[in-house]
């Protein structure tokens, strides 16, 4: 019964996200919403390995950036449409996550964190020096103003389901967020999720009990990397321009790590809550003050929650409920 209600809510949110694109004329809400939803997916994806499995990953921006550049390469090589670009980005980053995980997941603690940070640095350096994708100068991706599928006009100012690409991408990202939530919720309630929790709590004990820890970590890394890559695949199509400094920004890794910790890593709702609250504050700060203070906001929240509420928003709410009882 509870599961049916959950999926009905998901369906209702998909319908609402489409209605929003049809009823709202101002384009800024879609821009701000796109930025916040990107953070939600990144936070959820990070939490699969970092929260459920206990492996702190500083390389989220590497998968995001490589997903963005995978889309650029597929567009330049084959003039691939948006959905193919996103698919290529997800597959490439999943395979890269598998390879990276195999090389690094035998490391633990700070050594694993440093290895993932090194992946970010190496990835950005390679793209900086790859002229085919624009190198340090970046590359443009100019989407068509119309998009049709099986004769149906998806994007078009005259009679399309969406009047422009920004609205279409916002809707697609809403769907991706909801799909990611379903994936994370399924992991939490599965044998896979219980195995990740076991290795997070005590990896040696889990191994001695026969839990296939390496297999679980590789699966978690693949899923996490694929979701980050797919999110990155949206980036050049939405911005129409991508360059290494923004695609591989350390801000992306910091946000992906901090938002689950602030929201709470035990359940999928924690990363969503952390990303929505902090993402909204960042958008408000960008408009009213300056985007330069966005990381300051994240840092202050992170320090405060580490000291006063180490289990995040959800843990704090749970404690307050217990006190009330």
Task: Give the positions of each predicted feature.
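Transmembrane alpha-helices and adjacent helix-loop boundaries
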Residues: 1-325
